[in-house]
């Protein structure tokens, strides 16, 4: 079997993906690359997993060296909404992978655009579109390279970030958002199921590249339905047992809520919210596909069930 690499093998999506992947493929065929390889659980290393040290801040030469010998690479996008820097470091990594001889690149994109669209309103999507375009260009110029872009849906676990909540428990009596509560919503999806779905795609390609149906294609993994903000708040009310209303406010009022300033820190980052809500208003976060269900072999977990889990988890930590 081909050697599989994950970079960076850290964070929620990276950890979920390699944890699921290691139950599907021989561990001695997997290379995990991250900034702190010593943090990879020892049980995986003892089972044959190779660990290497690198990050997006590594030089192009160092990235090429750690990608050497890897046939299939899962490149997880750089965790920043800053467009140009994100594009710069991801382009460097993609070029290094091609030079190292990687044969197929899976890229973790974002489902913040209409399904299969090549343009989007959300600034946070811009670097993903750049990287998808660069992958296509690399593949056209190099016959030995192919790609799959996995557009991952918005995490249900991130609902508090968008809705301006300090957390899942003890929500305020009124949630304030800069949008019509009954307008286009979000097809929320459980984060670990995105990791599992990504792992299954990688394992499927590794086992039979010639029959893999998503070669040189974009695949969108979403939740099973789109929830309006009013519906989502109803779920939170039901799960927490509290009567919560939702109110449309101006974008400035929304951004000036203390919890939003705490989430986003800098004005530059907070300003990505302007385009994010424009995208939501245009239905660009509401796309639903059956692909994740087909890959998992079951219906993805409902938004309500995931919120229940999040509320219980947070309560146990308080």
Regions found by a protein language model. Give the residues of each.
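Oxidoreductase cofactor-interface core, primarily capturing Rossmann-like NAD(P)-dependent enzymes
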Residues: 2-40, 57-60, 81-85, 100, ...
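Short loop/helix-cap segments at secondary-structure boundaries that form the rim of catalytic
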Residues: 39-47
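Conserved Rossmann-fold cofactor-binding substructure of NAD(P)-dependent oxidoreductases
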Residues: 50-71
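Short, amphipathic alpha-helical "lid/cap" segments that border enzyme active or binding sites
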Residues: 64, 91-94, 191-199, 303-308
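Terminal hydrophobic/aromatic helix or amphipathic segment near a protein terminus
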Residues: 221, 231-282
């Amino acid at each position: 079997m081909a050697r599989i690499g994950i970079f960076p093998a850290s964070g929620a999506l990276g950890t979920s993906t390699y944890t699921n992947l290691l139950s599907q493929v021989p561990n001695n065929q997997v290379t995990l690359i991250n900034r702190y390889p010593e943090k990879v659980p020892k049980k995986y290393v003892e089972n044959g997993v190779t660990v290497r040290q690198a990050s997006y801040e590594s030089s192009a030469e160092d990235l090429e060296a750690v990608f050497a010998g890897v046939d299939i690479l899962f490149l997880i996008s750089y965790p920043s909404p800053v467009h140009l820097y994100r594009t710069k470091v991801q382009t460097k990594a993609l070029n290094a992978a091609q030079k190292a001889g990687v044969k197929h690149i899976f890229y973790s994109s974002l489902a913040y655009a209409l399904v299969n669209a090549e343009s989007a309103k959300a600034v946070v999507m811009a670097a993903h579109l750049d990287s998808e375009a660069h992958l296509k260009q690399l593949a056209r110029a190099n016959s030995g390279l192919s790609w799959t872009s996995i557009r991952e849906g918005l995490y249900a676990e991130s609902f508090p970030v968008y809705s301006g909540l300090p957390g899942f428990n003890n929500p305020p009596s009124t949630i304030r958002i800069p949008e019509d509560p009954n307008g286009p919503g979000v097809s929320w999806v459980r984060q670990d199921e995105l990791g599992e779905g990504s792992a299954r795609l990688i394992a499927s390609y590794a086992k039979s590249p010639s029959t893999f149906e998503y070669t040189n294609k974009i695949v969108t993994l979403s939740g099973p339905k789109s929830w309006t903000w009013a519906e989502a708040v109803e779920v939170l009310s039901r799960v927490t047992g509290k009567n919560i209303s939702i109110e449309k406010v101006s974008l400035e009022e929304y951004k000036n809520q203390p919890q939003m300033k705490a989430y986003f820190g800098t004005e530059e980052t907070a300003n990505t919210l302007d385009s994010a809500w424009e995208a939501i208003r245009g239905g660009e976060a509401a796309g639903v596909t059956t692909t994740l269900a087909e890959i998992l072999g079951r219906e993805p977990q409902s938004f309500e069930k995931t919120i229940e889990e999040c509320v219980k988890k947070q309560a146990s930590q308080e």
